[in-house]
């Protein structure tokens, strides 16, 4: 396997992010054009569709981190109440050579964490209250180092944009299914041709089947190797693979799913937020294998 430098990995993540944006814009235009045609909105509809796509891409690039944090109910971690967490984040950021990210906490008993943002200067790390309660200092440091690796490697923009894209794909599926179920545009359908109702029905059914598959394909770009790389890089940052290994062992033993778990954002977390439940869109490598690899590292 050809070894790549950190800068090459960062450049690859940026390229993939832009590729996702372009491909998704084409998909969105195709779906939107069907609505424009079906409701006979003409050139006005096409103009509004183009504006929507541009606006959505801007939101995905500039505001996706805020959307991700809001979607899980994350709040800024008070520096006095969570002074140990802030101290660890600052230490690890210094060791990783990146600016200290903003620190967030989500009220969730499952031990977990994720990083988000468009670049290291605009990054955030979020941990659950369950993680803070369950981990000792070395274990928490290992988890933070893992997330800091995603920030340093510029994984965060790609992961966050994919989450927003996946969320909209699921939303589009639901819109079609509701349109099919409630017969939105019924008068227009009867005025045009009854066959259009059949077309809408087929599109809704097809989307309901392929939307999760599209999500899976998109998220497959968030390779499992990225998690292995972040594990190893994090261990080297803090010069200790055993803290993260111990943390992953505790995380793996917690079997209850996250209350706010979503298939759109699952890949962002350090561990599968659905717990031990096997589901179609799993993006994380087995925790047992991650622990094994960490313990085999020589630092």
Swiss-Prot record:
Keywords: Cell membrane, Hydrolase, Membrane, Metal-binding, Metalloprotease, Protease, Transmembrane, Transmembrane helix, Zinc. One of its GO terms (biological process) is proteolysis. The keyword RNA-binding does not apply. It is a multi-pass membrane protein. Binds 1 zinc ion per subunit. GO terms for cellular component: plasma membrane. Its EC number is 3.4.24.-. It is found in: Cell membrane. The keyword Manganese does not apply. The active site is at residue 147. Gene3D superfamilies: Metalloproteases ('zincins'), catalytic domain. InterPro entries: HtpX_protease, Pept_M48_protease_HtpX, Peptidase_M48. Its cofactor is Zn(2+). The chain crosses the membrane at residues 19-39, 41-61, 156-176, 198-218. HAMAP family: Pept_M48_protease_HtpX. This is Protease HtpX homolog. It comes from Caldanaerobacter subterraneus subsp. tengcongensis (strain DSM 15242 / JCM 11007 / NBRC 100824 / MB4).
């Amino acid at each position: 396997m050809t070894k790549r430098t950190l800068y090459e990995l960062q450049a690859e993540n940026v390229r993939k992010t832009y590729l996702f944006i372009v491909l998704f814009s084409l998909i969105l235009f195709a779906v939107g054009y069907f609505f424009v045609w079906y409701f006979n909105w003409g050139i006005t509809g096409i103009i509004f569709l183009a504006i929507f796509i541009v606006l959505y891409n801007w939101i995905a690039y500039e505001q996706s981190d805020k959307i991700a944090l809001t979607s899980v109910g994350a709040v800024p971690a008070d520096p006095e109440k969570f002074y140990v967490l802030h101290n660890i984040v600052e230490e690890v950021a210094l060791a990783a050579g990146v600016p200290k990210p903003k620190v967030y906490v989500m009220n969730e008993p499952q031990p977990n964490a994720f990083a988000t943002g468009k670049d290291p200067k605009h990054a955030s790390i979020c941990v659950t209250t369950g993680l803070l309660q369950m981990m000792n200092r070395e274990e928490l440091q290992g988890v933070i180092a893992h997330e800091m690796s995603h920030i340093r490697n510029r994984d965060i923009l790609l992961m966050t944009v994919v989450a927003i894209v996946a969320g909209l794909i699921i939303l589009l599926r639901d819109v079609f299914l509701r349109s099919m179920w409630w017969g939105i545009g019924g008068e227009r359908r009867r005025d045009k041709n009854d066959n259009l109702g059949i077309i809408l029905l087929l599109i809704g059914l097809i989307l309901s089947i392929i939307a999760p598959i599209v999500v899976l394909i998109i998220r497959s770009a968030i390779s499992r190797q990225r998690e292995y790389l972040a594990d190893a890089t994090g261990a080297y940052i803090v010069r200790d693979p055993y803290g993260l290994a111990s943390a992953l062992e505790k995380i793996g033993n917690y079997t209850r799913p996250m209350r706010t778990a979503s298939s759109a954002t699952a890949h962002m977390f350090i561990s599968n937020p659905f717990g031990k439940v096997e589901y179609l869109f799993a993006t994380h490598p087995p925790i047992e294998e991650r622990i094994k690899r960490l313990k085999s590292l020589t630092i």
